[in-house]
């Protein structure tokens, strides 16, 4: 998922204010309601750390497993692995920066490795 908040003040870049993030994610619970409907086993958030102010993104049982920065191609990206519980089921989460077309092959490989590591 690339959009935790479904509205924006700019057609090309994320200029979502912190108050809008809090309102949409924590108060309206748009993201957590979507997750309950979709019932995923894995979630990848391409938001970087700019949405960490609304962490745990309205999800229960949120537990951080690994938080660091990782080199991807020529970039260094934020990388957060976590689990949450949705309707009694574990959900694996990865919050990472968006590759923006740079080092895409390395980025895809890292995310793929994460998915493989976390599939039961």
Language-model segments: which ranges?
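Catalytic core of non-heme Fe(II) oxygenases with the double-stranded beta-helix
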Residues: 11-17, 39, 43
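Oxyanion-hole/transition-state-stabilizing segment in secreted/luminal serine hydrolases
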Residues: 9, 48-52
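C-terminal capping/extension of enzyme domains
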Residues: 14-32, 51-120
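Short, surface-exposed acidic-centric catalytic microdomains
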Residues: 1-15
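Short His-Asn-centered micro-motif
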Residues: 2-3, 45-48, 96
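Proline-aspartate-enriched helix->loop->beta-strand connector
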Residues: 31-48
């Amino acid at each position: 998922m690339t959009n935790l908040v479904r509205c924006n003040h700019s057609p090309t870049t994320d200029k979502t204010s912190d108050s809008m993030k809090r309102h949409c994610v924590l108060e309206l619970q748009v993201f957590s309601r979507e997750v309950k409907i979709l019932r995923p086993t894995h979630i990848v958030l391409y938001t970087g750390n700019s949405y960490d102010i609304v962490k745990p993104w309205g999800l229960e049982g949120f537990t951080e497993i690994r938080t660091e920065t990782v080199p991807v191609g020529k970039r260094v990206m934020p990388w957060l692995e976590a689990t949450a519980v949705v309707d009694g089921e574990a959900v694996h989460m990865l919050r990472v920066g968006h590759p923006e077309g740079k080092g895409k092959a390395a980025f895809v490989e890292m995310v793929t490795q994460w998915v493989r590591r976390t599939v039961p």
